[in-house]
């Protein structure tokens, strides 16, 4: 190394001061994250170890709240309702969003206008959507039963039936969030190269073979991203369910979020509600990590 290179090299003390300045710039954001996310989370974990109802003295019970949840039939049913709702609210919009994206990816008259109309539902707030669909689900005056009568089908109780309440709520989710999946997949389709399609067509590949062996593998990462977003959103769904059914009839549509709300703000059982939050967080985190792992595997194999 020449003398000029040695003289031009930064001194260790200067580098240390420069690195410390980086931390100073990041420090305000870290303080906000700690105050808004980390501290409330740690406080929730701490509260879950107490038998604490608002207005009474808290008693330390350790893991009793968690063992109580494992034996609570209503909580276990809420978990099943949550997974049932989530499975339908993820799979169906993914399929319909993929089909819609494939349609709108092609050139046809008024494509831009129709695509804009198709994306309008996702712009509405969940509460507004829920209020509109509540009127549509009405057994006597709702428009859905009127449409069924036009084609000669018997009326349905929709959200007033324990059997059909969750599929009816999923229908709202499908209408509301399928456009989001379509936009994500459209972004993937727009980025696809044209060379593989041209080569495959020269070899005599059919449209189904083009989709099966070229399009689907290439847009798989985008579908997984859409699945992650929809899974987290469906697991967290509260406002739509609460406005339309309040968890009823009975507890037929009571998901973990509805159960949590009732424990915290109806029964004021803060300790039990905190334990539900911790369990639910672990469930969401595990599913998100699983889907992200599948996405990474899809990229590796691709």
Q: What do these predicted ranges mean?
A:
Residues 1-17:
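Short, Lys/Arg-rich, polar N-terminal cytosolic tail immediately upstream
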Residues 21-302:
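A structural signal for multi-pass alpha-helical bundles of membrane permease subunits
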């Amino acid at each position: 190394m020449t003398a000029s290179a040695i003289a031009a090299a930064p001194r260790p003390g200067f580098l240390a001061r420069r690195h410390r300045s980086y931390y100073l710039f990041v420090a305000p954001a870290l303080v906000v994250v700690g105050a808004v996310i980390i501290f409330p989370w740690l406080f929730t974990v701490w509260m879950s170890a107490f038998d604490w109802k608002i207005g009474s003295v808290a008693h330390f019970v350790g893991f009793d709240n968690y063992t109580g949840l494992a034996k609570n039939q209503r909580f276990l049913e809420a978990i099943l309702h949550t997974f049932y709702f989530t499975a339908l609210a993820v799979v169906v919009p993914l399929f319909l969003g993929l089909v819609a994206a494939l349609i709108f990816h092609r050139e046809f008259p008024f494509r831009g206008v129709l695509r804009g109309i198709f994306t309008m539902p996702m712009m509405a707030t969940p509460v507004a959507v829920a209020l509109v669909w509540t009127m549509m689900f009405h057994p006597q005056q709702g428009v859905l039963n009127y449409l069924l009568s036009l084609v000669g089908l018997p009326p349905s109780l929709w959200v007033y039936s324990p059997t059909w309440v969750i599929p009816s709520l999923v229908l709202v989710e499908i209408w509301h969030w399928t456009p989001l999946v379509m936009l994500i997949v459209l972004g993937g389709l727009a980025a696809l190269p044209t060379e593989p399609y041209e080569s495959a067509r020269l070899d005599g590949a059919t449209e189904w073979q083009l989709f099966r062996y070229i399009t689907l593998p290439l847009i798989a990462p985008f579908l997984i991203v859409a699945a992650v977003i929809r899974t987290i959103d469906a697991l967290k769904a509260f406002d739509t369910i609460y406005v339309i059914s309040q968890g009823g009839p009975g507890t037929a549509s009571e998901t973990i979020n509805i159960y949590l709300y009732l424990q915290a703000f109806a029964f004021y059982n803060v300790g039990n509600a905190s334990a539900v939050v911790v369990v639910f967080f672990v469930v969401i985190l595990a599913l998100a990590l699983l889907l992200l792992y599948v996405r990474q595997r899809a990229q590796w194999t691709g």
